[in-house]
Amino acid sequence: MIFVPLLVLGGAELGLRLAGYGYDTGFFRRIRVQGQDFYVPNEKFSYRFFPPAIARTTTPFRFAAKKATNSYRIFLLGESAAMGDSEPSYGVGRYLQVLLRERYPGTHFEVICVAVTAIDSNVILPIARDCARHQGDLWLIYMGNNEMVGPFGAETSYGLHAPGLAEIRTLLAIKQTRTGQLLDALIRRLRSGSSTPKTWGGMGMFMHGRIGYDDPARLRAYANFRGNLDDILRTAQRACVPVVLSTVAVNLKDCAPFASIHTPGLSTNQLSAWNEIFEEGITNETAGSYRDALALYRKAAEIDAQFAELQFRLGDCDLALTNFVQALRDFELARDDDALDFRVDTRINSIIREAASRHARQSVYLVDAARVLAQNSPEGIPGLNFFYEHVHLNFVGNYLLALDFAEKIKGLLPNSITGRDQGNWASEELCGRRLAVTVWDQQRVWQPIFARVTSPPFTGQFNHAAHLKLCEAKLNEAKAQMDTQTPEQARQMYEQALALAPDDYFLHAHFERFLEAGGHSAQAIAEAKRCCELVPQLPGGYYYAGTLLVREGKIAEAADYFSRAIAIRSDYAEAEDAMGEILSNQQKTAEAIHWFKRAIRANPNYVEPYLNLGFLQQSRGEVDAAMASYQKAASLEPEGPADYFNRANMAAALYRWDEVIACLRAVVKAKPEFWQARYQLGIQLAANEKTEEAQTQFSETIRYRPDFIPAHLNLGTALATQGKPDQALAEFRTVLQLDPANSSARQQIETIETTLHHNP
């Protein structure tokens, strides 16, 4: 009888595969580029571990299916810290690649980063199994930060909370089948109204997942990590690949706990006494009486020592009193007791060290990054000297970690490579030149970091204000450095780096952004197209190329690039919205609305399609619908540009014109590319007879959207009013190129030409 259900399941599986249903679960997929086969990331790999709406992907890469004879291939496994968040192009793998290439010329070192944001060891194990098939010479493993918050973690905001490994692997095996994927999709649909995230919300998604030091789910997560790590190392052993396994360093000194909870079972009297002592300690610490504060905190610890904030405050006091060894221990305990566990703790690093020891005879080599970064830190306690925030390394930190890896790798390289040893490792400064770390890039990297630390869970840290000041100082320091390098010097750095690495996608991508920021549109487009050639599987490359083409007025070509992005990723909201904008400006209303609504379905929290839909509705006189769209956008961006744009339109409905202008000025200051706001501001300024200012806003609107006909019409009118007929004619003729049937433009041209004829 068992054969009947097996036959049914087998038939269903075959039918689904023949119908093309489901997705490939492998980490890599094969593509062909100019007659050569390459492997690139499979964008749907993480669907087994995340709801598709919040699935994570790795950084762009491609490597030859047939490894060249002079190549040394390294796979770097881990999470966002290994990847190099917030800017992977300056991650540890990139620095390592430069170090090896500079010291051992003639060898093509491939450091392939297969690290992915927000994953954990449950995801890294199948990645490792796929890497085992692709001729790796060495694996680097730098993982552990997400064991509590990643898929199947103890604090995850989606899925099961730290089930056993057998259950996890059974579920993942089921999802490898198309039948399992169908069942998973049906279950998600039935739970569509549940608390499962619809879009990725970063670290703030895990705010409600607090667990204690000895919580059973936490202990299961540790056991799972140990089992997964052992299996990863055994996978490498079977593939005959040596492994450099590293402990993980974290910010101890400048990152307070994200959440603190008391030891379960304390009585009301104990909690009351603890709070009284703790608050008195804070009063003394704030006043600079660190010895008195320290004594009070230690007294509180006699009642409950597991409150993470208490341990961190002990660390601050010991640090102030130069008790550096004890301060380090205090900060480590604060990290270990953190109830929102985004950092590798003592137990995770102990598991890593123990695994390296157990597998030492199977070519597993330990790098103790946690100790190395501590030893190179002031007072022996790592902080913002090496980190952007809690775990992500800055330029200096990534270089130091890469140098530590390189030293270990040096002893593992074959004689065919070490025979060309140049004798020294490249300096951080030289690595920076090879990676084109311009002052413009340094400032650019700090901006998303600063935005991150102004959001949950960082806002929940008790010392958030002080931490924010430190980060703000770092950002200002980066901005101040902008004066130390001219744009031409930065450009030369890019060009020199590209001359040595002409196929480096990251260099081309950053050079593209740099050229765009400098107003070199044609060259920026060339770089964007080169990026598409290097990583043809990446939809973002086509999208960015399309946005540049729009600004150059090459609308048909831009639409083609947006279409190619959508062909790769059917739910690419940004590209769908961009298609809607093009069609809207071509007055293809129904098609434009279709694309805007499709973008909203793909990402309900994406502001732009609501604004663009509202602007289209407003132009059609559908005021109520437009206001509803603007209000939705405003709700997604409170106190942001969308909010002020909504306020401007609400004020316009009440004829409060000064308020309209003030709000629109605020919008364009905060978001210069918000072309609809610029256009509306131009209209208001023209109505107030501020013609020159209006002309500026219409010109800026056209710079961002050269296909927006009303801006050309209004700019032409403003120019004609100022007695500039030739320039006005140029704008009206542009309108006719965009819309040959435009009667307003024809009438304006006739009027100006008649005037010029009578008044030559």
Where are these regions (language model features)?
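Membrane/wall-proximal cationic-aromatic binding patches
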Residues: 22-104, 376
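Structural marker of alpha-solenoid helical repeat scaffolds
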Residues: 303, 337, 500, 533-534, ...
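Helix-start (N-cap) detector for alpha-helical repeat units in TPR-like alpha-solenoids
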Residues: 274, 308-309, 505-506, 539-540, ...
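Serine-dependent acyl-ester chemistry module
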Residues: 144-354, 372-384, 407, 411-495, ...
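Register position in tetratricopeptide repeats
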Residues: 286, 320, 517, 551-552, ...
